[in-house]
C-alpha cells in the first residue's frame, strides 16, 4: 500500500500486541507509509479512543525504514496524540513483529535474528537500541544500554522537589551510574482512599518520599519500600484488585506530577517497588498516558537498576513482577539482566490480532441534515361555537320499596 492509497481512502492495517498487560497497535510504515506527523497524531488519537475508535491499547507504534537502511525507526504515540521517547515492552513487541514480517531488515552487524531500532525520535538525537530473539521460543530481548543523565528538558535540577530539601546526587558508585537521589513532598490522600488501614486508622502519612531518578530512554522516579507507612505498602500491593488500591496509585502518580510540574515539565513515570516477597514487585504510573498501566518495560529496567545499584538484590538477573498485571494473570514477570554494555530486558510478546481500519481523515464526511422545511402557516380553526345552556334534569324519582 502506498502513500497515495492512504490519502485517497486507503485502509491502514495494524497488528495488536500484548506483553505483561501492556498493549500496542503496530502500524508498519514500510508497507503503509503515512504522509506526515499530523496524520500520525490524529490517527493515534482516533484509533486509541475507546468510545469512538478501536481502543483497547496503550499506544500506537509506527515502524519505518531508518535513513541509510539496515535499521528501523521506532516511534510511539500516546492516546492524546503526542509522541513520547521510548518504550521497553513496545520495543520487544516491535522486535517480535520484525521477526515475523520483516526478516530482511537486520542490524548493520548482520547478527542473525537481531534488529536495530532508532528510538527517542522527539529528542532530535535518535538513539540506537538492539532487539533480538532469545533462545526460548517466543522470547525477545532489548538492550537499552546503561542509564544516562537526565536531559535538561525533562528535569530541572535547580528546582526544589520537597520545598525544603533539594535533590542531591548520590555519592560513590551510584553517581557514576547516573542514579540521582531526591526527596520530594507528597500530598496526603483523602481519608476514604485507603483500605481499613493507613491514615484512616490514625497512622501517620509521610510528608516526603525519598526516591531515585533514572533516565533510560524515559524519565522514571523509583520509590522503594513503604516510606514509614506500612499500610501504604499493604494498600498499594494488595493481594487482589480493589478500587481503593487502584485509586490510591492513580492519586499518587497524578499528584506527584502535578505538585512537581516545574521540576518535571514533561512529566515523570512514578514507580513503587515492594521487596517483602521473594520477587520484587512494582507498579508504574505513566506520564503522557496519565494513568497506571498493567506493566512498564522501562519501569522494570529503572526499578531493577536502583535495586542493583543499592545492593537491595543479589547481583545478576532480576525478575520483576508487575503487580497490577499479576492481579489478572499470576506469574507475569519481566527479567532484567545487567551486562557490560547496559541492562537487557526480556519478555514474551503475544500477537493478539490483525485489523484494518480507515484513517480518521478517511471516514465519510458527516452528512448534514437537510434544511428544515417550515410547516405551512397555521390555519386558525373557526370560532368556537358555544354549546346551548345545560338543561337541568327533572328531580330524581325515588323507587318505591
Where are these regions (language model features)?
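Generic low-polarity alpha-helical segments
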Residues: 44, 142, 153, 182-184, ...
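C-terminal domain-closing interface element
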Residues: 142, 149-167, 171-177, 184, ...
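Polar low-complexity intrinsically disordered regions enriched in Ser/Thr and small residues
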Residues: 166, 200-201, 228, 375, ...
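Internal active-site segments that recognize and position negatively charged phosphoryl groups
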Residues: 170-238
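Long, intrinsically disordered low-complexity tandem-repeat segments
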Residues: 363-399
Amino acid at each position: 500500500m502506498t502513500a497515495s492509497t492512504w490519502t485517497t481512502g486507503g485502509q491502514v492495517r495494524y497488528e495488536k500486541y500484548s506483553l505483561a498487560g501492556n498493549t500496542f497497535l503496530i502500524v508498519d510504515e514500510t508497507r503503509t507509509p503515512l504522509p506526515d506527523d499530523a496524520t500520525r497524531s490524529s490517527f493515534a488519537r482516533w484509533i486509541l479512543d475507546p468510545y469512538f475508535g478501536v481502543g483497547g491499547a496503550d499506544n500506537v507504534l509506527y515502524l519505518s525504514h531508518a535513513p541509510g537502511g539496515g535499521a528501523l525507526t521506532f516511534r510511539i504515540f500516546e492516546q492524546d496524540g503526542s509522541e513520547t521517547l521510548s518504550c521497553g515492552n513496545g520495543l520487544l513487541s516491535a522486535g517480535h513483529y520484525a521477526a515475523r514480517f520483516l526478516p530482511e531488515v537486520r542490524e548493520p552487524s548482520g547478527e542473525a535474528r537481531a534488529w536495530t531500532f532508532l528510538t527517542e525520535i522527539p529528542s532530535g538525537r535518535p538513539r540506537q537500541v538492539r532487539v533480538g530473539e532469545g533462545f526460548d521460543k517466543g522470547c525477545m530481548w532489548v538492550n537499552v544500554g546503561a542509564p544516562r543523565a537526565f536531559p535538561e528538558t525533562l528535569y530541572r535540577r535547580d528546582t526544589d522537589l520537597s520545598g525544603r530539601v533539594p535533590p542531591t546526587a548520590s555519592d560513590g558508585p551510584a553517581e557514576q551510574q547516573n542514579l540521582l537521589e531526591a526527596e520530594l513532598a507528597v500530598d496526603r490522600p483523602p481519608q476514604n482512599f485507603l483500605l481499613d488501614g493507613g491514615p484512616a486508622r490514625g497512622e501517620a502519612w509521610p510528608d516526603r518520599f525519598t526516591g531515585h531518578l533514572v533516565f533510560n530512554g524515559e524519565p522514571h522516579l523509583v520509590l522503594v519500600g513503604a516510606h514509614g507507612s506500612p499500610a501504604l505498602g499493604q494498600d498499594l500491593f494488595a493481594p487482589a484488585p480493589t478500587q481503593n488500591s487502584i485509586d490510591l496509585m492513580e492519586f499518587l502518580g497524578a499528584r506527584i506530577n502535578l505538585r512537581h510540574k516545574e521540576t518535571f515539565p514533561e512529566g515523570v513515570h512514578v514507580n513503587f517497588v515492594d521487596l517483602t516477597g521473594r520477587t520484587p514487585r512494582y507498579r508504574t504510573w505513566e506520564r503522557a498516558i496519565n494513568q497506571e498501566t498493567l506493566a512498564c518495560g522501562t519501569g522494570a529496567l529503572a526499578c531493577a537498576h536502583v535495586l542493583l545499584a543499592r545492593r537491595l538484590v543479589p547481583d545478576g538477573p532480576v525478575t520483576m513482577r508487575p503487580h497490577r498485571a499479576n492481579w489478572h494473570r499470576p506469574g507475569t514477570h519481566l527479567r532484567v539482566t545487567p551486562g557490560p554494555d547496559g541492562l537487557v530486558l526480556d519478555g514474551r510478546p503475544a500477537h493478539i490480532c490483525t485489523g484494518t481500519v480507515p484513517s480518521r481523515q478517511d471516514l465519510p464526511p458527516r452528512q448534514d441534515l437537510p434544511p428544515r422545511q417550515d410547516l405551512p402557516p397555521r390555519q386558525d380553526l373557526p370560532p368556537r361555537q358555544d354549546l346551548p345552556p345545560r338543561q337541568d334534569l327533572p328531580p330524581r324519582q325515588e323507587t318505591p320499596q
